[in-house]
């Protein structure tokens, strides 16, 4: 689960991380209240969406920049008015962009130098890893590609926690002065506590800055949490912004389906994440474009299959459907019955290709064969993929 920058900074403050003073607003009337909380001078106006690249983004009406540095409150209010309710397109939103429904006003900071700092889960080592760089304010992927020697990594033993020597190592490699180093050490420890105690999957600050008076501030904040651990943090669940999520993905989660919308026109219904990714790959291989990732899991019920079809058909870009099932735990006949019920309920008019293999496959194929449905059978994954690509061409 992702949260907005203003929410992440509020969380940071609870752990003692220094952040610029700020205030969010959701309406033009709230602009006045929010700005009244801030001192006169430079104000940074930030669009709040769950995507990066806001500063370089463009709104659909042509207004450029989802982050604006303003010299006065009047200028900040004017910029916020152009952002609120507008749709911001960035490199991470896709062409559809995201509608801005919250504005975050920040007091401007005096920047001496910018850094990058993030805490992530390294699945290769099964440990948290702190990633830091002297090149802040830039895309970390570009830094890793162009100047990999400027990125430092410290893996943390979860049984022991973040050690003092590891903090000192980071402070030394990042080149902080003695005065800055004390504040940086405090901030790094606070960020790690925030990461660990909230079951976060990512805490990112880009940029982390030093100021002329030796302070170390989190100028930006991005936090994501492990969905599987949210039951331990009901206070974090309240921060979820459903407006930032695809309605189809929200509906899928209600039925315990793993769904991610994509930009293609061939919908996929598959059991198992690995098979789902392979199915998308083979569709691309034969010239098609997948419309989604949809894993119904190893023990889906008939009701879940019906729900999956309804979610798929909620995407207006879908021109055909490929069902690819390999039954291990999954009973192929349950899938087949779900397909029959779903098609009859929603009145499917799109091409449908079904490939079934594995547990109780004979009964599943018999159910489909006697259903009277207009569908195409696939003898193999490659055969099924070729058929659906041809049908939607």
From Swiss-Prot:
Keyword Ligase assigned = yes
Cofactor comment text: Binds 1 Mg(2+) ion per subunit.
Positions annotated to bind substrate: 271, 328-330
Q: In which pathway does it act?
A: Carbohydrate metabolism; tricarboxylic acid cycle; succinate from succinyl-CoA (ligase route): step 1/1
Role description: Succinyl-CoA synthetase functions in the citric acid cycle (TCA), coupling the hydrolysis of succinyl-CoA to the synthesis of either ATP or GTP and thus represents the only step of substrate-level phosphorylation in the TCA. The beta subunit provides nucleotide specificity of the enzyme and binds the substrate succinate, while the binding sites for coenzyme A and phosphate are found in the alpha subunit.
The entry's keywords: ATP-binding, Ligase, Magnesium, Metal-binding, Nucleotide-binding, Tricarboxylic acid cycle
Pfam families in the record: ATP-grasp_2, Ligase_CoA
The family assignment reads:
Belongs to the succinate/malate CoA ligase beta subunit family.
Report the GO molecular function annotations. Answer: ATP binding; magnesium ion binding; succinate-CoA ligase (ADP-forming) activity; succinate-CoA ligase (GDP-forming) activity
Catalysis performed (reactions) = succinate + ATP + CoA = succinyl-CoA + ADP + phosphate; GTP + succinate + CoA = succinyl-CoA + GDP + phosphate
| Subunit | Heterotetramer of two alpha and two beta subunits.
* EC annotation from Swiss-Prot or TrEMBL: 6.2.1.5
What is a single cellular component term in the Gene Ontology annotation?
A: succinate-CoA ligase complex
Q: Which cofactor does it need?
A: Mg(2+)
| InterPro entries listed in its UniProt record | ATP-grasp_succ-CoA_synth-type (IPR013650), ATP_grasp_subdomain_1 (IPR013815), Succ-CoA_synthase_bsu_CS (IPR017866), SUCC_ACL_C (IPR005811), Succ_CoA_ligase-like_bsu (IPR005809), Succinyl-CoA_synth-like (IPR016102)
Please, which domain of life does this record's source organism belong to?
Answer: Bacteria
Q: Which NCBIfam families match?
A: PRK00696.1 (NF001913), sucCoAbeta (TIGR01016)
Which stretches make up the ATP-grasp domain?
9-251
What is the uppermost EC class here?
ligase
Enumerate the residues binding Mg(2+). 206, 220
- Set out the biological process GO terms recorded for this chain's protein: succinyl-CoA metabolic process; tricarboxylic acid cycle
Which residues take part in binding ATP?
46, 53-55, 109, 114
Name assigned to this protein: Succinate--CoA ligase [ADP-forming] subunit beta
